[in-house]
């Protein structure tokens, strides 16, 4: 029998801020889902990826996938 894969799914959430028509600052709400091996990577993931809501590359930080 094969071993179970140890990788977990994590959510990478955009840190970009979008200003609404009323002047409020809100998160864009855009995210990516990635696999991560907790045995090899102990730090939280951070990537610079494209956010289509703000149309630029921004920092994405790891959050818990619900």
Swiss-Prot record:
InterPro entries for this protein: Ribosomal_bL33 (IPR001705), Ribosomal_bL33_CS (IPR018264), Ribosomal_bL33_sf (IPR038584), Ribosomal_zn-bd (IPR011332)
Cleavable signal peptide: none
PROSITE patterns for the chain: RIBOSOMAL_L33
MF-aspect GO terms: structural constituent of ribosome
Alphabetic keyword roster: Ribonucleoprotein, Ribosomal protein
Swiss-Prot/TrEMBL GO biological process terms: translation
A GO cellular-component term linked to this record: cytoplasm
Family: Belongs to the bacterial ribosomal protein bL33 family.
UniProt name for this protein: Large ribosomal subunit protein bL33
Source organism per UniProt: Wolbachia pipientis wMel
Gene that this polypeptide is encoded by: rpmG
């Amino acid at each position: 029998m094969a071993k179970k894969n140890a990788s977990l799914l994590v959510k990478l959430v955009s840190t970009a801020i979008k200003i609404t028509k009323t002047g409020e600052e809100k998160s864009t709400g855009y995210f990516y889902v990635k696999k991560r091996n907790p045995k090899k990577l102990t730090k939280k993931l951070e990537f610079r990826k494209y956010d289509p809501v703000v149309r630029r590359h921004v920092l994405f930080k790891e959050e818990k996938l619900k």
